[in-house]
Amino acid sequence: MEETQRSAEYIFQGIMYYFRREKVCPRYQFTLKDPVDPALLQRALDAALQAAPYFKVRMVWEKQDAFLEPNPEPCLVYRGSTQPQMPEQTNGYFFAVSCEESTVYFDWFHFLMDGHGVSPFLTRILELYCNLRYGTAFADPPLPSSPAYDIAALVERYPLQLMDETTLQREVVQTCESTMHRARVRLTKQSLVRKGVENGAKPFTALMGLLCIALGEYLGKDAIQYSYSGDTRDAMGVPDASYNCVCSFQDGVALHEGIRLEEFVGPMDAAVRESLTPERKRRKMADQMGWVYKVDQQKAP
């Protein structure tokens, strides 16, 4: 992005996160073998930003329109483990790098980026820090960043159902407050692989099935709904997208007392596999993003 360039093309992909009542701000943290040198970490951050201009942006508003433009403010390394408010306390940046003793913290606002998109950038910061601190030789080429996908073309290819007051009203999942109880369940990767192989299913499906059984027993329910997300970069033709590029699916399973995983994991696994085909993922993206596109089309000039 050039210094004078202003763009709105990446806003759509994460705008639903921007207007949520509660911000989604994930955190990655890494414990190093030695105390972190903040000055070297700052140098690594500065160098990584030069290789990844997508992250060196701020958002500006003009009336009802939001744009991204290059951020001229310094991107600072913060001291301590407290997560700063992004972008209010981070000079307009939508991520933050902090350190305390031997731990490095990476915080990011789930608006311009998702976990898949931000990980190469955060990895680059660590690599450059290791180059400076320990004399390693990690390369520092520009980080690729795919252009925004064409939402208009996506919606045209997968037309949305007519949205009115009736179709927009959905049943709200009822919640209640009660005393929290915690239970720790230890599942190893090997045990999930074994369960999946035994039942001809993905380890992920085996995990979801076991969790559904446990939740059904814990909550005293005979049906459990579950959700999962799939990365859509390859399906959308944007393999190096830094922005949000996931779709979410929901399904459910009927339970009964004493039910075993092998009784239902087959159909569950088939549904998961079918939902993660490129065509299904593109259609789901159109369903998720279509309303954002339609609302934007209706705003006053």
Functional labels for PLM-detected ranges:
Residues I125, Y129-R133, L215, V272, ...:
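Short, well-ordered alpha-helical segments in soluble proteins
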Residues F95-E100, D164-T166:
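A short acidic-Thr-Gly-centered motif at the start of a beta-strand
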Residues E2-I11, L112-K195:
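Non-catalytic, low-complexity flexible loops and terminal extensions
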Residues V104-W108, S227:
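Beta-strand elements within well-structured catalytic alpha/beta cores of enzymes
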Residues C25-R27, E101-T103, M180:
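Short, solvent-exposed beta-strand edge segments and adjacent coil->beta transition regions
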Residues M1-K63, E73-A96, G216-P301:
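Acyl-thioester-dependent acyl-group transfer interface
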Residues K33-A52, D107-T123, R184-K221:
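Acyl activation and transfer enzymes in specialized metabolism, enriched
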Residues Q64-A66, V104:
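Hydrophobic residues embedded in beta-strands of well-ordered beta-sheets
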